[in-house]
Structure formats: structure tokens, C-alpha cells
Amino acid sequence: MPLPLLLRTRNDLRMEFYDLIVGVEQAETSPRPVVGVIVVVSGLAVSFLLWLLYVHHASADFAQRWMFLPALNAFLNGLCAIALCVGLYFIKHRNKEAHRKSMLLAFAFSSAFLISYIVNHTLHGDTIFPGHGPVRTLYLSILASHIILSIVALPMVLTTFFFSLTGRFAMHRLIARVTFPIWLYVSITGVVVFVFLKAYAY
């Protein structure tokens, strides 16, 4: 067996053994209470966002202020999508440290987006898509999937990070396989929704 392949195999076995040992140690403390708190907090956050979208009415005094926020939101979503793809690349190549940094960066971009999103909707309210016909149906379909999956993504992202930061790597890998595509889809469709609104704004 070639030496590089042998070394890589030993490294893989060492990582798997470490994950197993850590998993046994962490198994003594149930993650259910923390996951329960994450679900409750996520539910409260989603409830607030739904209120902001469909109940809150923006003041006309702020209608023309900070008009750059929608573009900033799309930019942050795009950066998040890039960071997610880079993180996937690194973990596929067994570079755990670079993967961790990339995913933390993606989380930072998503957090910044959420803050900017709340400020934008507080000041400006919801934006109505002016298009008609099939393009409106397409837009609403993308928007609906974006909103629904963003609701699902919030607790999943937090739970995935919790498992990683507490050393529960087996559970982290298991849930990350579901979290990643949802998070990536939400980030990409956030940009797509902005492009639709911008293209039909005039």
C-alpha cells in the first residue's frame, strides 16, 4: 500500500476512534433539553418574523430610508451560500479546521442577514411582487418554499452547530446531511427572490 494512502487511512481511523470516544463521553449527558430549548426559541423567533411580515405595518416616515437593505440582504445570502459550498468542499477533503471556519462564517453571514432583514421589514414592511401571469406563480412558488424551509432551517442549523460544538460528531454528521441542502436552498432562493423583485420593480 502506498505510504500516503496508508497515512490517510490511519488518520481516518484516528478521527473515527476519537469521534467514537467523544460520543461515548457525551452520551452520558442527554442533548434533549438543549434541543428542546432550541426548538422553543426558534418557534418564538419564527412567530416574531411572521408577525413582522403579515401584521406589522411600516411607518410612511421611513419609506425612503435605508433603501439599500434589500440588496444587502441578497448580498449576505449570496456570501452565505458561497461559504456553505466552501465548507462542503473542505469537509469532503477531510480538512475539519477549514470546514469549521467556513461554516462559522456562513452562520455569521446568516445572522447578519437576519438582523438586516428585521430592520428592513420594520422600516419598509413587505414588498409586493408586481408581476402577473406565470411569472407571478413561479415567484410565489419560490417565495413559499423559501419561507417554509427557512422556518425549518433555523432550529436545524442551531442544532447542527450544537452537536458540533459539544463534540457529538456522529449526530452532527447525521443531521448536517439534511441541514446543509435546506440551508443552501434558503440562501440561494433569498437571492433569487431579490432578483425577481428588482427585475419587475419598474
Question: What is each stretch, according to the model?
Answer:
Residues 6-7, 12-202:
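Alpha-helical membrane insertion/targeting regions
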